[in-house]
């Protein structure tokens, strides 16, 4: 009879470059072999334990939670969780070991163990080949700590000395009075993963497989072996002992009890009463004329459900964070599903008035869905750290931490790691990387490999690609989530291990953001949004120069001039609708009101595009197609002309037409979002179809709805999310239209952000007749600023003065000292500037080269001469007479100034580079962007321009969109996949690009369909012009 067995020492791929199999693969194989349980014991981490728990549930095979540990100057052991007490003890041990070491490492000391270590079982893995006395000492120390909860692990892997090793281990166990147990040191689910495991070992140790030597296992026996194979190596009683240990380990992750912090509640209040009071206060501000009956009913419904689900403290915490931001003059706005909530609006978390929208609260919280809400709040991108540190101060690092993201291997990165350890030279690795797609994880086809000069049948290449395919999708390391916070009433280390983040002053839990819902932890996302920084700076500038303090809430709505500007696609620099695809859509959709912007934000997304929703909507909007939908679904489809554009509409259709409950509809939403990655949508096909047919809907309508639903698997927008973003879109457009100087100035001061570089933003401002003044130490602060025009008109009475931040390599500290010194008296010459502002030679030379000393000293050549040799500290020589030898230096040429501008500032206020080349280009019959406005459709022609952006959306079937800029404006170029592949080097490498192609002009949108590309970069003669590619 084959013995029963439980594997107590097994590493998954969440051991990061050790285990060569996923938890799912391990549990499926162990279940197939008839194991009684499986322990996942990744080294000093529980990063993969939630996924292991899910794999355990799906297979029915019990999970034992544990971790392999190396104690500094001590033994190696596997710690297994017996009870909740033991789980908390293990989390604390991992936390303390990780927190005292730098990221990616740990240091576990003997003194970290509690005297009793209750709830933890230990399997000692002795080094019997090493120092015998040290080995005995390790065993005695463990026996003192764990007593009857300690075993000696016997691990045999078909070595030549297995028989002797078994005898020695059993003798050691007997001499110390420690029972023995069989374990496998499993690193893979099947022997076939040995090559991958060897590869990962070499990657981890920064060596090649050929040179890894003893670092590699001697054979492939560290896999989940069948029971009969185990019985050949181990005595039955050793195998049976593993099952007895497994039966002691009864802890399950569902036993975790998570509580949100309570300290935000004043004395005499409960979380429920305090949330209601804050909501009522906010409601009086939001609705000064009182709530309508419908809104009052919605608020009451939400408060009741929040209390029922015990989420009161969560809402109070988010409110507290938002209130802190506002007290610090940090602009913020909630978005996503939280925008469905009237309570969130009343609390000031979101800005979307539910009375003016038709949003679905069940998208946010559902009685039937046993999971927490997810509130995302955007903050100014350059001030978010203040909010993050406030949370750490408010709750302490023991109770607040950021969530992790399990960064996984992707195609090119996986190949590079594999190829390197297999010994390929760097030039071949770089060339092979070119054959990998930037936009998918699929391996290159043999045809593509041949295009890049590789023989697809070469054994080494086949091996590289095979191992790369296995490695893709494996966890590579834990990184920090952009802003997802977990905050707890009790120390987080009792729930999950905490470790140091790569960034200073930050800590992260070991669980991925996707794990949190499964174990019931609530997360609040503290996200960064550059446009909020730009809007707040714009509001400040307008207040400074106009005396008017605007807010997001009180900007004039439905402004005709703003919508006319939007419909012309005059949207460079604004939020969301500045991309190449959005600007092409705007003249076709021609937004006239806020809800049109909501649709515009949502419609240029992979979901609606792949669900074939864009063209039907446009045809119906332009009265080219009849608007049809079942009368019962009028409330769902009327606002989008019968075309489902939002996730909420799909949920409403499922509820009304197919009989889904709100909770079931939310499950459908989740399936929509994840079906391409995890499947799970097909079961809904029949459910939807049957329900819709039963309720009298046509079969073709049901089928069409399902196909559109599948499109949402490619990032369809929730309406609440689109509406939140549309608020910022409108605000940025209104400011661009009515306060263009302030808006452009704020954008540059908030950079890096958005789609365009400062140079492109300034070129656009100049095309809008905004005066741009150069960097000048007599007037410039660190930030760009606004100055009155000498002869102001009624509308454009402010100019932009470029700030010292524009000077490449110039430090903010130096700029602040210039501001301070200048406030006392004006600078008289270079020596006065350098001495009083404490500038070193490098800083003074940067100012001279950039032209910032032109007003003080003269042109660049003169300024460079003047600052040469001037030092910041010359106290011994201050009173000595100086010899001032005047040197006559030639003025820079226009071309020299242009090159120096781009080299030092990244922009120019002189002529556009293309203006200097226009005569040369015109002689070759090149057209300008201005010419294209009057040329007829289908004309073939050539244009040339600076490449300011390249995009290749995932929904574009390999099409690359290129934006060129000349002295008059921009040209949009479409490069089909075959041409992009043939001329990849020219397409990706050119700064100045010539395109020969066919002009396509439809509905006010003009593109040039490329037929041939030419690199004209040599004509720029070293000009440093940088594009913003694939943003």
From Swiss-Prot:
Q: Which Gene Ontology molecular-function terms are recorded?
A: 3'-5' exonuclease activity; DNA-directed DNA polymerase activity; nucleic acid binding
The compartments listed are: Cytoplasm
Can you supply one Gene Ontology CC term for this chain's record?
Answer: cytoplasm
Q: Which reaction does it catalyse?
A: DNA(n) + a 2'-deoxyribonucleoside 5'-triphosphate = DNA(n+1) + diphosphate
Q: Is-annotated flag, keyword Ribosomal protein?
A: no
Function recorded in the entry = DNA polymerase involved in damage-induced mutagenesis and translesion synthesis (TLS). It is not the major replicative DNA polymerase.
Q: Which family does it belong to?
A: Belongs to the DNA polymerase type-C family. DnaE2 subfamily.
Q: What is the name of the protein in this document? A: Error-prone DNA polymerase
Natural source organism: Pseudomonas savastanoi pv. phaseolicola (strain 1448A / Race 6)
């Amino acid at each position: 009879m084959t013995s029963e067995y439980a594997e107590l020492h097994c590493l998954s791929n969440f051991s990061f470059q050790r285990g060569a199999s996923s938890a799912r693969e391990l549990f499926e194989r162990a279940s197939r072999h008839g194991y009684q349980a499986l322990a996942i014991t990744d080294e000093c981490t529980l990063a993969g334990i939630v996924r292991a728990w899910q794999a355990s549930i799906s297979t029915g095979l019990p999970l034992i939670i544990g971790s392999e540990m190396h104690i500094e100057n001590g033994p190696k052991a596997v710690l297994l969780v017996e009870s909740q007490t033991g789980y908390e003890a293990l989390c604390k041990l991992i936390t303390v070991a990780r927190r005292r070491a730098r990221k990616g490492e740990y240091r576990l000391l003997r003194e970290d163990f509690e005297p009793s270590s209750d709830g933890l079982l230990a399997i000692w893995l002795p080094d019997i080949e090493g120092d015998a006395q040290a080995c005995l000492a390790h065993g005695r120390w463990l026996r003192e700590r764990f007593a009857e909860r300690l075993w000696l692990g016997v691990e045999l892997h078909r070595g030549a000395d297995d028989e002797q090793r078994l005898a020695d281990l059993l003798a050691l166990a007997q001499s110390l009075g420690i029972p023995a147990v069989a374990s496998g040191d499993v690193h893979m689910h099947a022997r076939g993963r040995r090559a991958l495991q060897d590869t990962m070992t070499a990657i981890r140790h920064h060596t090649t497989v050929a040179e890894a030597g003893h670092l590699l296992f001697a054979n492939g026996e560290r896999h989940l072996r069948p029971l009969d194979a185990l019985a050949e190596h181990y005595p039955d009683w050793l195998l049976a002992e593993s099952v007895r240990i497994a039966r002691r380990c009864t802890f399950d992750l569902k036993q975790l009890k998570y509580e949100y912090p309570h300290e935000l509640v004043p004395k005499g209040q409960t979380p429920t009463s305090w949330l209601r009071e804050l909501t009522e206060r906010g409601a009086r501000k939001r609705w000064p004329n009182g709530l309508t009956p419908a809104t009052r009913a919605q608020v009451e419904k939400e408060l009741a459900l929040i209390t029922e689900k015990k989420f009161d403290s969560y809402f109070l915490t988010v409110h507290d964070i938002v209130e802190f931001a506002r007290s610090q003059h940090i602009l913020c706005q909630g978005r996503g599903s939280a925008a469905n909530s009237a309570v969130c609006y009343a609390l000031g978390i979101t800005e979307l008035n539910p009375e003016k929208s038709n949003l679905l609260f069940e998208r946010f919280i559902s009685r039937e869905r046993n999971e927490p809400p997810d509130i995302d709040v955007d903050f100014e991108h350059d001030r978010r750290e203040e909010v993050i540190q406030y949370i750490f101060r408010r709750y302490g690092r023991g109770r607040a931490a950021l969530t992790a993201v399990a960064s996984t291997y992707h195609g090119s990165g996986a190949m590079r790691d594999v190829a390197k350890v297999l010994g390929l030279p760097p030039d071949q690795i770089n060339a092979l990387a070119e054959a990998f797609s930037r936009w998918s994880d699929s391996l290159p086809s043999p045809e593509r490999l041949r295009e890049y000069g590789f023989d697809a049948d070469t054994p080494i290449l086949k091996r590289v690609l095979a191992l790369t395919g296995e490695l893709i999708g494996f966890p590579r390391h834990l990184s920090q989530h952009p802003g997802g916070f977990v905050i707890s009433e009790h120390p987080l280390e009792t729930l999950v291990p905490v470790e140091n983040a790569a960034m200073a002053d930050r800590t992260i839990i070991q669980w991925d953001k996707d794990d949190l819902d499964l174990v019931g932890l609530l997360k609040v996302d503290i996200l960064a949004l550059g446009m909020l920084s730009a809007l707040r700076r714009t509001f400040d500038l307008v207040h400074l120069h106009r005396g008017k303090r605007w807010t997001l809430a009180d900007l004039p709505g439905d402004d005709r001039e703003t919508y006319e500007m939007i419909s012309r696609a005059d949207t460079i620099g604004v939020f969301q609708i500045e991309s190449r695809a959005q600007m092409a859509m705007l003249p076709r959709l021609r937004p006239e009101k806020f809800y049109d912007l909501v649709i515009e934000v949502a419609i240029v997304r992979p979901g609606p595009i792949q669900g074939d929703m864009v063209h039907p909507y446009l045809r119906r909007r332009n009265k080219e197609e009849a608007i049809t939908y079942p009368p019962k679904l009028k409330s769902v489809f009327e606002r989008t002309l019968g075309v489902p554009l939002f996730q909420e509409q799909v949920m409403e259709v499922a509820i009304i037409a197919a009989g889904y409950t709100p909770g079931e509809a939310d499950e459908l939403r989740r399936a929509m979002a994840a079906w391409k990655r995890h499947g799970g949508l097909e079961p809904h096909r029949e459910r939807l179809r049957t329900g819709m047919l039963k309720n009298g809907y046509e079969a073709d309508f049901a089928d069409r709805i399902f196909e559109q639903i599948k499109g949402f698997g490619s990032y369809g927008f929730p309406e609440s999310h689109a509406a939140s973003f549309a608020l910022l879109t409108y605000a940025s457009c209104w400011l661009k239209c009515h306060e263009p100087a302030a808006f452009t100035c704020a954008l540059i001061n908030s950079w890096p952000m958005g789609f365009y570089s400062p140079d492109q933003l300034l070129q656009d401002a100049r095309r809008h007749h905004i005066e741009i003044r150069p960097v000048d130490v007599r007037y410039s602060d660190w930030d760009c600023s606004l100055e009155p025009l000498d002869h102001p008109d009624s509308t454009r009475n402010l100019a932009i003065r470029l700030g010292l931040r524009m000077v490449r390599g110039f430090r903010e500290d130096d700029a602040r000292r210039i501001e301070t010194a200048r406030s006392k008296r004006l600078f008289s010459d270079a020596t006065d500037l350098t001495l009083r502002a404490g500038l070193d030679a490098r800083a003074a030379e940067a100012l001279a080269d950039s032209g910032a000393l032109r007003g003080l000293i003269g042109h660049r050549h003169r300024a460079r001469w003047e600052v040469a040799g001037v030092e910041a500290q010359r106290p011994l020589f201050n009173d000595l007479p100086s010899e001032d030898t005047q040197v006559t230096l030639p003025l820079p040429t226009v071309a020299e100034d242009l090159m120096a501008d781009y080299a030092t500032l990244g922009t120019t206020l002189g002529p556009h580079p293309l203006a200097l080349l226009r005569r040369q280009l015109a002689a070759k019959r090149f057209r300008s962007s201005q010419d294209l406005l009057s040329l007829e459709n289908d004309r073939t022609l050539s244009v040339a321009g600076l490449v300011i952006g390249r995009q290749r959306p995932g929904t574009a079937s390999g099409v690359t969109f290129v934006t060129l800029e000349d002295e008059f404006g921009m040209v949009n170029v479409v490069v089909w996949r075959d041409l992009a592949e043939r001329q990849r080097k020219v397409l990706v490498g050119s700064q100045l690009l010539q395109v020969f192609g066919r002009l396509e002009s439809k509905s006010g949108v003009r593109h040039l369909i490329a037929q041939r590309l030419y690199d004209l970069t040599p004509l720029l003669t070293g000009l440093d012009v940088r594009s913003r590619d694939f943003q």
